[in-house]
Amino acid sequence: MKKIILISGILLLAINLVMILMISCHSGDLSGQPGNQSIAADNYLKYCAGCHGSKLEKFAEKAWMDEEGTSSAFSSIKFGIETIGMPAFQKTFSDPEIEALAAYVKKGIPEDRSLLKPAVTPGGVVESEVQKFVVDTVVSGLNVPWGLAFLPNGDMLISERSGSLLIFSKGKLSPPVEGLPPMMAVGQGGLLDICLHPDYDKNGWIYFSYSALNTQSKKPIGNTAIMRARLKGNALYDQQVIYKGTPETDRNYHFGCKIAFDGEGHIFFGNGDRGQHFDFPQKLDNSNGKIHRLNDDGTIPADNPFIRTPGAIGSIYSYGHRNPQGTCIHPVTGDLWISEHGPRGGDELNIIKPGLNYGWPVISYGINYDGTILTNEIEKEGMEQPVFYWIPSIGPCGMTFVTGDRYKNWKYNLLLGSLPLKHLERVVIKNNSVLHREELLGGIGRVRNVVMGPDGYIYLSIETPGKILKLMPVL
């Protein structure tokens, strides 16, 4: 009797093992079947394209793209990577759906990855709704250019997020400028914006935003910082760190940080929430999730809104922000405008007023990346509404108001870059309301910065492929 039971048990175990192997093999095949790939494509566009690009271009440099199989991609999708802001999707997708999504991503990258990097047709005339122009490539071969500023002699300062500062002069790039501080150059961190003091001709100050690395810590931690320095030859000197955000964290995203001067001796910039939205943006005892205002020497203005609030950081000008990526002053009203990234949907365009609460994360028009509800509130007493919000997200970045007479049909329009959707966006504004939007240069690359040059032309910095473009109007 015992032998019969034992034999039966062995047979049952063998049958189960065969069934498990069949199911396992079948599940592996499912990921590549047309129906499942179609579902994976839909899931990618719905959940992933906003950050990684609709054509999968952000995956081209991932190390796991060259690995056999999909185990690394599967793990990243299922469990996420908190330090870089990659959410976990284990509650959103089943394992077969994750496997299909991982297979879709790997299958979608062409062998020639340069095909993922769109180029502008040289000399081709771009016809927008009200303005014709030609796109001229001024500088190429850059590594994720971020900031862009012009010296009085016409030389161009370019920051690369990897931590290099370059000078473009007479058609050539300099070696990296010496004298920069230690940086947390990982993820979204590194060397960020560059801005010349309005009286640069007299004082020579150049301002830099960057993710400062704590060199005393055993693990890499840091936060947004602002340094000013002077330039001589190919080196910086008189370096002064005038701001360093607190607390420091090991997360390498949501640093902000564009710089703007108001013409009255004040510098404005945004410090992102550092990926901890429930901890920082609504509290005044930390720097994160805030717009800051300083005097140009780093001291705190006497009329800052929270300077007399017990426990508050004195440089805070407004709070309740997620990740401000664009900062500029309106050329007529003098108002401070910012663009900031929402989560999935809910990117915002805001006019910043002192002491106001802009709501994040209590109110938002977006949801979590994995599709779950972030908040049920889109408005609340005591919290500001955006001038405009984008659904779906465009990932708005550096921006500027068009000035001068070279682009008469765009005058005082707002131009801002889109990172994930890879276009330049023109926004028509009247009485602080958005009347119209136009997408320009679709597929040009991740538009990181938009700058009005001293020559009156519009310049764009493109992350991938790394280059600086100039828009030449055609009459």
Question: Residue spans of the language-model regions?
Answer:
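N-terminal export/targeting leaders of redox proteins
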Residues: 1-38, 96, 116, 124, ...
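Acidic, Gly/Ser/Thr-rich repeat motifs that build Ca2+-stabilized beta-propeller blades
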Residues: 98-100, 105-277, 326-329, 335-342, ...
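Conserved blade-ending motifs and adjacent loop-strand segments that build the rim/top face
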Residues: 434-454
